[in-house]
């Protein structure tokens, strides 16, 4: 007997959102961590990728990294001299804007700076990313890298990709079993521009870039500044000099209701 189309299973459960308990846990974890480490860095992340960040956590397993709402992290550190949890720490909160995190460490600051200066991973761009350069597929036979390498070091794309390339807007056609832009010699086409420098990529463009194995995103961590417990001083690093700073705290205190409305936390890492 055929299965009834009306016999559907409706799941009534929901995934619990991070609520007040998670916020309070992140808040208390940051405060408990402050006296255990000599230095606290504020870092920003370009083109966040969780798999690359996991590698950072693994390689810096003697440090502790926190991510969360910037207002919550700032409040945990203390935004005024009266509220700060250690001498001079409130001056670090001016860097807590945008996609940033806190890194607590006992390593020498020079070692941390050296590690992150050499950290860079390229990846496929996602929708919403700004194109760092113009990418144009040359006319003629379409190759697997879209013209990123010379034809003699490349191979033509498979004929099975022709329908998808057409669906994504490329005016390709089959000529003698090969996917081509214009004719086989490239004389009847000017090539196809996938994206232009400075424009925001959409999902169609990112799919085309991925089909041609073109990586336009770079996962990179920039150190903005750090606080040292021994001196109570905050040292501004090069990336922090050009980044917009957090405005001064307009309120000397925030009650629990305000924290619950304005701030939600992400998980921290040991």
UniProtKB/Swiss-Prot annotation:
InterPro entries: Mrt4, Ribosomal_uL10, Ribosomal_uL10-like_insert, Ribosomal_uL10-like_insert_sf, Ribosomal_uL10-like_sf, Ribosome_Assembly_uL10
Keywords: Cytoplasm, Nucleus, Ribonucleoprotein, Ribosomal protein
Chain positions covered by the region annotation Disordered: 234-270
Stored Pfam families: Ribosomal_L10, RL10P_insert
Subcellular location: Nucleus, Nucleolus; Cytoplasm
Sequence ranges of Basic and acidic residues compositional bias: 238-250
Entry's family note: Belongs to the universal ribosomal protein uL10 family.
UniProt protein name: Large ribosomal subunit protein uL10
Originating organism: Chaetomium thermophilum (strain DSM 1495 / CBS 144.50 / IMI 039719) (Thermochaetoides thermophila)
């Amino acid at each position: 007997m055929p299965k009834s189309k009306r016999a559907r299973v409706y799941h009534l459960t929901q995934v619990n959102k991070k609520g007040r308990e998670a916020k309070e846990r992140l808040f208390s974890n940051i405060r408990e961590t402050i006296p255990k480490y000599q230095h606290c860095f504020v870092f920003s992340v370009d083109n966040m990728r969780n798999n690359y960040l996991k590698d950072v956590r693994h390689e810096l397993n003697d440090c502790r990294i926190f991510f969360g709402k910037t207002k919550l992290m700032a409040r945990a550190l203390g935004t005024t001299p009266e509220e700060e949890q250690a001498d001079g720490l409130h001056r670090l909160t001016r860097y807590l804007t945008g996609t940033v995190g806190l890194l607590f460490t006992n390593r020498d600051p020079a070692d941390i700076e050296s590690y992150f200066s050499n950290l860079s991973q390229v990846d496929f761009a996602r929708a919403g990313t700004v194109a760092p350069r113009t990418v144009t597929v040359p006319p003629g036979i379409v190759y697997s890298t879209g013209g990123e390498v010379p034809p003699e070091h490349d191979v033509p794309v498979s004929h099975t990709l022709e329908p998808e390339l057409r669906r994504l807007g490329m005016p390709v056609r089959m000529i003698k079993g090969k996917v081509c832009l214009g004719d086989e010699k490239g004389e009847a086409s000017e090539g196809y521009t996938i994206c232009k420098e400075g424009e925001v990529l959409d999902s169609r463009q990112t799919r085309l870039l991925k089909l041609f194995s073109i990586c336009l995103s770079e996962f990179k961590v920039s150190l903005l500044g750090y606080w040292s417990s021994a001196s109570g001083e905050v040292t501004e690093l090069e990336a922090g000099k050009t980044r917009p700073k957090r405005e001064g705290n307009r309120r000397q205190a925030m009650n629990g209701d305000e924290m619950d409305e304005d701030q939600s936390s992400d998980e921290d890492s040991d």
